[in-house]
Regions:
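Predominant activation on well-ordered alpha-helical scaffold segments within soluble catalytic domains
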Residues: 10-14, 48-55, 68, 72
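DPxDG-like acidic metal-binding loop motif
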Residues: 40-62, 85-90
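Generic structural motif recognizing short loop/turn segments at the entrances and edges of beta-strands
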Residues: 24-26, 39-41, 88, 97-100
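Surface-exposed beta-strand edges and their flanking turn/coil or helix-capping segments
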Residues: 6, 41-43, 106
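ATP-dependent small-molecule kinase catalytic core of the GHMP/sugar-kinase superfamily
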Residues: 62-124
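ATP-binding N-lobe of GHMP and related small-molecule kinases
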Residues: 1-38, 56, 60-62
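Gly/Ser-rich catalytic serine loop of serine hydrolases
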Residues: 33-45, 79
């Protein structure tokens, strides 16, 4: 993937480890088919990959709710992190303690089309 996405994976990984006072080094090779800077959640996917990698390094089980909260805190884009983790169309609302994620139902009569612009636009 793009080096910016790699930086997001690394930053989220290091941030997740640092919460437990840990550090790590090494090389990670990754790839993604999500177009970068096109509004499809590549940044959220990169952040979540870093968080999941930190869990794996520590030997901890996946915790989707905790991963979502960490991604929301790290990036602030719950609208992309929620569908990335939980699938489907999701609404994300700020909560007193943690963001509230709600699944939204879609009619089968609704179709989607997407055309990626030739130039990327950062949403961070």
């Amino acid at each position: 993937t793009d080096s910016v996405e790699n930086d997001l994976v690394t930053a989220a990984f290091m941030e997740a480890l640092s919460k437990d006072g840990l550090e790590a080094g090494g090389t990670v090779h990754l790839s993604s088919t999500i177009p970068v800077a096109r509004g499809l959640g590549s940044s959220a996917a990169a952040v979540l990959a870093g968080i999941d990698l930190a869990l794996a390094v520590r030997g901890l089980p996946e915790d989707r709710d905790a991963a979502f909260c960490a991604a929301y805190e790290h990036e602030g884009h719950g609208d992309n992190a929620a569908p990335c983790l939980f699938g489907g169309l999701r609404a994300v609302l700020p909560g007193a303690i943690r963001p509230l994620v709600t699944k939204l139902e879609l009619s089968d009569m609704i179709g989607f089309a997407y055309a990626a612009p030739p130039a990327g636009i950062s949403t961070i």
